[in-house]
Amino acid sequence: MQALLKLSRGIDWLNTQVGKYVIWLILGSTFISGVNAVVRKAFNISSNGFLEVQWYLFAASFLLAAGYTLLQGEHVKVDVVSSRFSKRTQIWIDVFGYIVFLTPMCMAVLWYGIPFFTRAFVSGEMSSNAGGLIRWPVYLMMPLGFSLLWLQGVSELIKRLAFLKGLIEDPTAKKAEKTAEEE
């Protein structure tokens, strides 16, 4: 179990690093969005390429941050129901959710997303808009983001099983450490 906990710490570190860089994608998306709006209104000029970069960055930030968001315990849960149960029961509900819902959903996205990306990459698929961009970078974000989410699900599963065995403290307790946004 110690080897699995070490793997869990490695996955947590990876998603924390990704979370730190995704913050910059959000800033870039916001900057490009602002420049697009000003240039379009002030000079009556628009670029499909810049509009597409804007939504590429927006999509990348949400997809790549999914694992980090799970690490921080910020994914939506039905706490109204689970808060009535004991901590062990809540942990078992999490274990059930990771195995029955999160893993199959991530695997389905990977199963269909990887060939989707591969076809776009091999064919050099382009946007149908004049001045549009190649599509494969944004298609790559789907399998990449869901891989990070699934890995974080594995990490959370390991931590919860270790808690149930009495090897670690409650992994769902909020820690006083800084998040990537605060650093």
Q: What is each model feature region?
A:
Residues 1-183:
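Alpha-helical transmembrane segments and membrane-interface helix-loop junctions
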